[in-house]
């Protein structure tokens, strides 16, 4: 009996020490059209995101109590979603896209975090990113989103919030509309 208890105790310790590791795939969500400013341009622009980004990026837990589990994401998935959403806004506003245009918007992620909200009934996620234009303008943003379901949805939603933030920036709108 004591031997069985020792084995059980040993197994429990191993489980607690290794904790849980999850790899998530962020979803892509629609943008809120009321938050997007209209723009107009006939000058081609390209959207740049890092290629071959980190495939096993640890999403930092920013809550007050330590978490045993770790959540990882492939940053290429977030970049893919962000690029698609930015290009969708440009195309919807009839701004031509070109992969070799000197005019560009460059989107770079600097940090992804998550935490429990509302006593654990909701999950919040934060995305810090930089947006840079071809004329040298650069701005750092931190956006957030939440989900009552899971981290995947909360992190995926931050990409939509980031793109909405980009297209509210007057300097970016002016740059896109300039010749």
Where do the model's predicted regions map?
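Short hydrophobic/aromatic-rich motifs at helix boundaries and adjacent loops
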Residues: 1, 57-60, 101
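Sec-dependent bacterial lipoprotein signal peptides
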Residues: 1-20
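A generic structural signal for short, solvent-exposed coil/turn residues
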Residues: 12, 37-39, 99
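A structural "domain/chain start" motif
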Residues: 20-79, 84, 174-179
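Surface-exposed short loop/turn segments
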Residues: 21-31, 88, 92-150
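Short alpha-helical linear motifs
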Residues: 54, 127-129, 165-169
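Short secondary-structure boundary motifs at beta->alpha junctions and helix caps
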Residues: 63-76, 134-177
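Structured segments of extracytoplasmic/periplasmic soluble domains
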Residues: 85-96, 165, 169, 173
């Amino acid at each position: 009996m004591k031997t069985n208890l020792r084995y059980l105790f040993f197994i429990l310790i191993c489980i607690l020490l290794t904790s849980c590791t999850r790899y998530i795939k962020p979803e892509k969500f629609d943008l809120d059209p009321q938050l997007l400013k209209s723009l107009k341009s006939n000058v081609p622009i390209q959207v740049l995101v890092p290629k071959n980004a980190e495939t096993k990026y640890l999403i930092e837990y920013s809550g007050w109590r330590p978490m045993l589990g770790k959540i990882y994401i492939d940053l290429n998935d977030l970049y893919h979603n962000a690029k698609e959403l930015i290009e969708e806004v440009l195309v919807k506003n009839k701004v031509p896209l070109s992969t070799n245009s000197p005019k560009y918007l460059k989107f770079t992620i600097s940090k992804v975090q998550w935490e429990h909200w509302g006593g654990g009934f909701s999950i919040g996620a934060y995305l810090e990113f930089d947006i840079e234009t071809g004329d040298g303008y650069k701005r750092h943003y931190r956006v957030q989103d939440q989900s009552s379901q899971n981290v995947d949805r909360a992190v995926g939603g931050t990409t939509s919030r980031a793109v909405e933030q980009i297209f509210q920036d007057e300097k970016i709108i002016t740059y896109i509309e300039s010749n």
